[in-house]
Amino acid sequence: MAETSSLISGVAQRCAGSLFELALDANSVASVEKDLGRFEALLSGSEDLRRLISSPVFSSEDQLHAIGAIADKAGIKGLVGNFLRVVAQNRRLFALPGIIAAFRQIAAEHRGEISADVVSAHELTSAQQNELKATLKGVAGKDVTINVTVDPSILGGLIVKMGSRQIDTSLRTKLSSLKLALKEVG
């Protein structure tokens, strides 16, 4: 499984790097990032679309036509629309979530930012997000872009992943640590 994950990661990095170079040449990094975000929202909202990109059962022609129709309907044209079609034609749709994440990371590095993945038990308000960004900026010494994911199973607190560092202040982790400590005592 680790080999498959690194393979996807390698494909994602190469594809994202190529897309970034094209976007940089066209002076459209921000619009490409926005279009990728719109496609990612479609992806997260549709089980059928996730199945289409991950299943080897669909032919490349079927994937190409479906992705083209979805991109057109969503108004994703130009560089990202063409890129999605090429990825579908080359049977690399399975790597799209990784490509989008890698593109964001490359674009953030180009802007001198660092990206942080934040998991919280509930939606963070704008004020909470701004306070978190300011705190993380103090730690990292760079502007920080946060990608917030809601996971009610952590019960409370936050899990922040920034580069190779992870800060886990979730209630779930604290309860697990307490449970382990009580087992050692008893």
UniProtKB/Swiss-Prot annotation:
InterPro entries (alphabetical): ATP_synth_OSCP/delta_N_sf (IPR026015), ATPase_OSCP/d_CS (IPR020781), ATPase_OSCP/dsu (IPR000711)
A cellular component annotation (GO) from this entry: proton-transporting ATP synthase complex
Keyword Membrane: yes
One GO MF term: proton-transporting ATP synthase activity, rotational mechanism
Keyword set, alphabetical order: ATP synthesis, Cell inner membrane, Cell membrane, CF(1), Hydrogen ion transport, Ion transport, Membrane, Transport
Membrane topology of this protein: Peripheral membrane protein
Location within or outside the cell: Cell inner membrane
SUPFAM superfamilies, per database record: N-terminal domain of the delta subunit of the F1F0-ATP synthase
Ribosomal protein is among the record's keywords: no
Gene3D superfamilies on file: N-terminal domain of the delta subunit of the F1F0-ATP synthase
Domain of life: Bacteria
Pfam families documented for this protein: OSCP (PF00213)
Assembly and oligomerization: F-type ATPases have 2 components, F(1) - the catalytic core - and F(0) - the membrane proton channel. F(1) has five subunits: alpha(3), beta(3), gamma(1), delta(1), epsilon(1). F(0) has three main subunits: a(1), b(2) and c(10-14). The alpha and beta chains form an alternating ring which encloses part of the gamma chain. F(1) is attached to F(0) by a central stalk formed by the gamma and epsilon chains, while a peripheral stalk is formed by the delta and b chains.
Family: Belongs to the ATPase delta chain family.
Job description of the protein: F(1)F(0) ATP synthase produces ATP from ADP in the presence of a proton or sodium gradient. F-type ATPases consist of two structural domains, F(1) containing the extramembraneous catalytic core and F(0) containing the membrane proton channel, linked together by a central stalk and a peripheral stalk. During catalysis, ATP synthesis in the catalytic domain of F(1) is coupled via a rotary mechanism of the central stalk subunits to proton translocation.
Protein name, per record: ATP synthase subunit delta
Taxonomic lineage: Bacteria, Pseudomonadati, Pseudomonadota, Alphaproteobacteria, Hyphomicrobiales
